[in-house]
Amino acid sequence: MMRKMGKWMLAVILVCGISLTSCNRDDNSASEQAGQQFQKDLDQAMSWAQVYGPPTQSLAEEVAARHKGKATPLNYKTRESTERKCRTDKSSPFELRDLARTTVLCEYDSIRNVIEDIEKTATTSGIFGRYKHQTSDRGYWGDLFNMKFEYLYTEIQVKSYGNYYAANPEEICRPVLGDSLYNVIYTACGGLEPGLSHHYYEIIRSDTTSDATREYYKKLCIEYHSHFDPDFVE
């Protein structure tokens, strides 16, 4: 009797083991398929960004020229950054709105006109997606548009020259602004280092353990922004 019971138990264990192995194999297979599909979607979305980036840049340059401004070089989000953003937000690559992006730079007094011009031009071209005025408790403010194409959105930001200086390190902003304008802004802000706005933001965003540290850099960020153009929206 005990021998029969032992054989029965062994059979049950073997069957259960086979079932668990099968389930694990199915789970792994589904996970692999999902990962492969994500990489395919990523490839496709980044390919569409290459297609929709140039017309986005053309619109930005067209508007910038009408207002004696500048358009920054077209920029594409890296694959690594795109994948990280998707996994963090649990989103599809096609849901990201800034795989291709550029910025229109202008004098502070021209910002409203530039915003109106971008919206009008994009609407006429049939690619206007949305407009958003952004603010934060760190003193940062800015404006962005999303151009809506068939398979993907792209992004156009609008910044004053001073706020572009505040957001980007010298190796990025000096070539775009040119030496003359860069030096004017450098003098006007009292010789402050460019790009500290983004630098402080990255510290605040990455430090999730210390409220005191985040508050310290938040105050630094607010003080830094006070040397540049104030938000034009009251």
Placement of each model-derived feature along the sequence:
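Intrinsically disordered, low-complexity polar/charged tails and linkers
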Residues: 29-86
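Repetitive helical segments and hydrophobic/amphipathic motifs
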Residues: 13-16
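C-terminal motif of bacterial Sec signal peptides marking the signal peptidase cleavage site
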Residues: 19-22
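Bacterial signal peptide processing site
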Residues: 24-26
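Long beta-strand-rich cores associated with HINT superfamily self-processing modules
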Residues: 86-234
